[in-house]
Amino acid sequence: MSKLDDLIQKLCPDGVEYKPLSEIFNTRNGYTPSKKEKNFWENGTVPWFRMEDIRENGGILDHAMQYVSINAIKGDPFPANSIIVATSATIGEHALITVPSIANQRFTYLMIKNQYRNEYDPKFLYYYCFKLDEYCKECLNQGNFASVDMKKFSKFQFPRLPMEIQR
């Protein structure tokens, strides 16, 4: 048995509980501020993430290749330690974003609900989302444009493990 198996057996003697994505996270789609509004794109301070950021800088990100001004934001930026998941076009990629930010419309933000903040380690969720990536590829809507079936997406199951195991 592996060390992980030993920990699970020791700390979860009754088995591992699973929770659906929709119970653990609030979700919202990313967006692109209007390119016609020059002031949205000049002297920006809020990171705006695109697929290129993941490809160039990896899956745990604290800065973006492009920034937008606070005037470009609809409401508030998405909170730090959110996960972005590609749910259209290039499906099956994700990143942990460790700073307040926005991302383009290819991404769905997963923002952990307050009642689960102390129960999940952001890096554990990031690594577990590699399973979500594969699940997304199996849950596509039929049509001309590849996109994830969001009803199925919301049902994806995350294990509820003790922090000792997550870390």
Regions found by a protein language model. Give the residues of each.
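Sequence-specific dsDNA recognition surfaces
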Residues: 22-37, 52-80
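Short, recurring structural edge motifs at helix starts
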Residues: 5-13, 35-38, 95, 144-145, ...
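Amphipathic alpha-helical segments
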Residues: 15-17, 121, 154-167
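Non-catalytic DNA-recognition/assembly elements of restriction-modification systems
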Residues: 7-31, 163
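Short, compositionally biased
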Residues: 96-109
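Specificity-determining recognition surfaces
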Residues: 108, 127-158
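Short, structured motif recognition centered on aromatic/hydrophobic residues
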Residues: 16-24, 46, 81-84, 153
